[in-house]
Amino acid sequence: MGNAPSRTEPTCDNSINFIIPKENKSYQCYPEQVESNPIDSINSVYFYKTT
């Protein structure tokens, strides 16, 4: 491992609920496109939709 990632986006696993601190909103995260809202995660790009 190298430097710690400076991102605030959490890692997505299937469909989980999480909150983006910048927007303080609740989202559901999926490993595929739901609504074209990509999240640049640590490992890959995920998509989320507002709940």
Curated annotation (Swiss-Prot):
Superkingdom: Eukaryota
Protein name listed in UniProt: Uncharacterized protein DDB_G0286943
Species in which this protein is naturally found: Dictyostelium discoideum (Social amoeba)
